[in-house]
């Protein structure tokens, strides 16, 4: 079998035209490789059995499994299967960094802060030590409890940094109206200006002041909530909207698993109505959910049927993550939500019914540990090796001759569906939002910048390699300006986080390359790569409304779930780290940087590969083929 090497990816990389022979290794069912630490030959690895919040004593892990119990890893050294040590003792290079990010402590045991912290939204499941610390943070909870969040609900529009000038002008008008009303109150010898609300000469001015004052009070209240988290200083809780306000809102959104828009949008305003302890409890449930998914090997989350269910009455994901626009109707033979009921069952067995109960449990289990609980059975079609396939619907496609001057909001967004053969029935397991290509900047050979259409290839492909902790080898066509970030102190820095590996990598946490199969005259096959793949993404909001450079982006936490599911339910071989020598000098504003990457990631080869079919979608533009002309680069 021949395989055309991938260099980079849908970030504009050109695939290698050469092919190399695939390594011939014997494949083994992934179930044999999964958690080797749970059992040890000739010994009893004990786990704690818990039922309805009560400790039932210790039991050998093998006995617990034989009794139909599920073993949950609640240690702070847990990682998804993708990043865990293999049965042969191989450790993915990203393993240690994953644990550092999950525990929010770096290699020197210093706190990870700023933009490097709060990576749950980008695919890193927080350690239970983080949950324990947040629930026990009494000063923070007391600060929030002293604030009545109700005034925030008076906002009837979304505010952002773009609203800075409007907010400032509105506040000036508020002060002017308040001064005028106060003077009239004094002139009439009123105790308060309320009677002016019904005075024909003053009611309009009073109504305008009242609305502006409600907006000001709402902003001040929201900023006080953010101050409790340490993200705003006292002087920034003045009702203005600055870049510091936007940054603080983004941190709040990242901490509470909301889309990181930096906007005071409806979801964020609603979350601010929720107590800090309740928000921390929801974090605990999200952490537990990923441990349950890992332990049971399930992936079915209801997105292919009637949608995800609440866990203990709580929806754990924002609505935008539950379905692509235009893809909410149940699919034929769509699998029901198993993830939420399984998580709720685990929470009930552990006694995690509220913030105080979780806090007490974690206080009694400071080291975490592995526990055995009784959970509902997994579907009968689950097996160590399953017949799986995937389909990507490109949704509504517009082949515009030139980049449109606005962001097009299509009715039918792209989606990815994973199927399983359920004893002859093609069962849709999940249906997740994704992206397709569009217009993007590209550097030409002469150094000039243009925009070029980045097409998402249509037709049958396969996923052969699952690459955990992938790096992005930025091709020469990627402009230098896209590889640097402004430090806002007169200097720039290389975007090492975008090169990876890590949650902010251009490929996210997992990459599944799309390979095209060609038959050879000798009966063999050649696998060609065109630089397109399915992968995680730190560009969370682009999955809701944006486009890519041709690849199919997934929310990082879902990409990790998909990669884990493939390893649990598909024969594979461990290829290990993929060495590479990537070097590039990046120059911007008289500063130079050297990019250095020595691995493409830790690879697992699926045997056989999983079939993927990319549908043409609904081409709604007059033009029916991708545009070939270039367009001026974005300013």
Each model region followed by its residue ranges:
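Bacterial N-terminal signal peptides
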Residues: 1-9
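N-terminal pre-domains immediately preceding structured catalytic cores
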Residues: 10-635
């Amino acid at each position: 079998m021949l395989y055309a090497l991938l260099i980079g990816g849908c970030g504009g990389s050109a695939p290698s035209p050469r092919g190399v022979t695939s390594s011939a290794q014997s494949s083994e069912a992934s179930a044999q490789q999964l958690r080797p630490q749970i059992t040890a030959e000739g010994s009893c690895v004990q786990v704690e059995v818990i039922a309805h919040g009560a400790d039932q004593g210790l039991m050998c892990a093998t006995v617990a499994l034989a009794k139909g119990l599920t073993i949950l890893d609640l240690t702070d050294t847990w990682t998804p299967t993708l990043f865990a040590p293999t049965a042969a003792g191989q450790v993915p290079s990203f393993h240690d960094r994953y644990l550092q990010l999950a525990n929010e402590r770096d290699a020197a045991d210093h706190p990870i802060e700023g933009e490097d912290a709060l990576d749950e939204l980008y695919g890193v499941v927080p350690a239970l030590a983080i949950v324990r610390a947040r629930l026990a943070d009494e000063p923070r909870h007391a600060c929030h409890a002293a604030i009545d969040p109700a005034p925030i609900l008076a906002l009837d529009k979304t505010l952002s940094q773009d609203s800075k000038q409007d907010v400032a002008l509105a506040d000036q008008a508020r002060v002017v109206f308040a001064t005028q009303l106060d003077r009239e109150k004094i002139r009439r010898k009123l105790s308060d200006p309320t009677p002016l609300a019904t005075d024909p000469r003053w009611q309009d001015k009073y109504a305008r002041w009242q609305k502006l004052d409600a907006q000001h009070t709402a902003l001040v209240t929201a900023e006080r909530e953010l101050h409790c988290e340490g993200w705003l200083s006292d002087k920034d809780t003045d009702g203005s909207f600055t870049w510091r306000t936007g940054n603080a809102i983004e941190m709040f959104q990242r901490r509470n698993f909301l889309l990181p828009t930096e906007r005071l949008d409806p979801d964020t305003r609603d979350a601010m109505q929720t107590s800090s302890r309740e928000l921390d409890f929801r974090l605990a449930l999200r952490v537990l959910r990923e441990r349950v998914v890992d332990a049971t090997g399930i992936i079915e989350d209801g997105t292919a049927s009637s949608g995800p269910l609440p866990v203990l009455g709580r929806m754990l994901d924002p609505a935008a993550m539950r379905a692509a626009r235009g893809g909410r109707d149940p699919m034929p033979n769509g699998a029901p939500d198993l993830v939420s009921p399984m998580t709720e069952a685990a929470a009930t067995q552990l006694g995690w019914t509220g913030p105080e109960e979780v806090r007490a449990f974690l206080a009694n289990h400071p080291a975490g540990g592995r526990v055995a609980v009784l959970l509902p059975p997994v579907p009968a079609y689950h097996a160590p090796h399953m017949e799986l396939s995937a389909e990507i619907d490109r949704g509504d496609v517009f082949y515009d001759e030139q980049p449109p001057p606005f962001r097009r909001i299509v009715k039918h967004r792209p989606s990815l569906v994973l199927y399983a053969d359920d004893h002859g029935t093609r069962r849709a397991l999940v249906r997740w939002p994704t992206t397709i290509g569009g217009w993007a900047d590209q550097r030409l050979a002469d150094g000039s910048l243009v925009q070029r259409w980045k097409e998402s290839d249509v037709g049958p492909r396969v996923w052969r390699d699952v690459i955990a902790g992938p790096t992005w080898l930025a091709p020469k066509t990627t402009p230098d300006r896209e590889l640097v970030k402004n430090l806002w102190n007169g200097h720039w820095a290389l975007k090492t986080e975008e090169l990876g590996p890590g949650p902010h990598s251009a490929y996210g946490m997992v990459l599944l390359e799309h390979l095209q199969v060609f038959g050879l005259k000798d009966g063999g096959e050649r696998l060609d790569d065109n630089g397109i793949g399915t992968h995680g993404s730190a560009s969370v909001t682009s999955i809701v409304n944006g486009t890519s450079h041709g690849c199919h982006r997934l929310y990082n936490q879902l990409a990790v779930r998909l990669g884990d599911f493939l390893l649990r339910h598909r024969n594979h071989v461990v290829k290990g780290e993929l060495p590479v020598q990537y070097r590039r000098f990046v120059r911007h504003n008289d500063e130079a940087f050297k990019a250095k990457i020595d691995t493409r990631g830790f690879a697992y080869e699926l045997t056989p590969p999983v079939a993927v079919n990319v549908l043409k979608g609904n081409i709604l533009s007059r033009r029916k083929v991708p545009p070939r002309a270039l367009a001026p680069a974005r300013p």
